[in-house]
Amino acid sequence: MKFTIIGKALVVSAAAASLAVGMTACGNDNTSGTASSSGSASAECGGKNALTAEGSTAQQNAIAEFNKAWGQACAGKNLSYNGTGSGAGRQQFIAKQVDFAGSDSALAKEQIEKAAERCGGNPAWNLPLVFGPVAMAYHLEGVSKLVVNADVLAKIFQGEIKKWNDPAIAALNAGTALPDTDIKPVYRSDSSGTTDNFQKYLAAAAPESWKKGAGSEFQGGAGEGAQKSAGVVQAVQATPGAIGYVEKSPAAAAGLPFAQIDNGSGAVELTDDNAKKAIAAAKFAKDGNDLALDLKSLYSTKEQGAYPLVLATYEIVCSKGYDADTAAAVKSFLKVAANQGQANLSKAGYIPLPDAFKARLLQSVDAIA
């Protein structure tokens, strides 16, 4: 089945930021409490008041919106989220130091058994809650519209295409006067889920050109490294001829232009609606309530008008194995996040969940015991 999935994968702040999640009420004997009148949907407010989570910084701002909504829908509820990175979040979840993890990637094969042990012998589930488009931000004087594709990007970030007027780029930009300027690729020098997803995109959409693999460390071997998203934005701003991959929100805030991406069916601008089209074409890796995505189906889509470079982030939870108070609170938070918590996501640079995907996500949330 295809589901439209979009939300922005961003970093979550700690307890200081009230993180709220809009969720639809879902009848469950283990979740008690009164529904709040605030928000667009009633909320189940059972379970303990304080939850802890850790992980992805890409979803952090979205988590802050969710926590704010949770506190409004369920008085006294609060999630303390520590944005230490996806790897640290998964480790802390497995070690039972937090109630759930935020992660830019689903659990790795070698982590699945350990996560099940943490969950009392029950599987941990990867629930994609936050989606954010990744922009190809650039700095090229006199060029207000630029089109690239996965093949061109793969060759740029490996140092094979070195000039902006290279014939491969010119072929995608008919009618545009491209300068004879050196291309300056900018990549994340720190371990990054954005890097991992960017390289997965290149591997899926340009397998003949990108053979460097994926992973949270940049493998291309060309360009200038910069720390975190803010560093990429600053480097692109300061460097004529630069191009870098970075989450849409910080790039837009800096006023940087974004390249359009030709997915094989024409050039596509980065908009919420165009990103949703790509997510609608994506598939889950397997059946059941573990909703890990088949990223190849997302990144290699040729759906007309679909912007394919989208970062998905997960909440990694126990399917069973929580005590009753924790299970009820986790479900409450996730339901609010999927409902009331969606209201301000677009302003924060994320893509609100489409109804069809939200309904599927809530089925899995409902099944947490």
PLM ranges: what are they?
Residues 2-4, 11, 25, 43-46, ...:
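Extracellular/periplasmic juxtamembrane helices and adjacent flexible linkers that interface
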Residues 7-17:
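Sec-dependent N-terminal signal peptides
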Residues 20-23:
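Bacterial Sec-type N-terminal signal peptides, specifically the leucine/valine-rich hydrophobic h-region
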Residues 27-30:
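Bacterial signal peptide processing site
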Residues 33-170, 233-235, 249-254:
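N-terminal segment of the mature folded domain
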Residues 64-76, 94-98, 106, 138-141, ...:
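Sec-exported extracytoplasmic/periplasmic mature domains
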Residues 90, 191-284:
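Ligand-binding pocket segment of bilobal, Venus flytrap-like solute-binding proteins
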Residues 133-137, 143-233:
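Extracytoplasmic ligand-binding site segments that recognize negatively charged/polar headgroups
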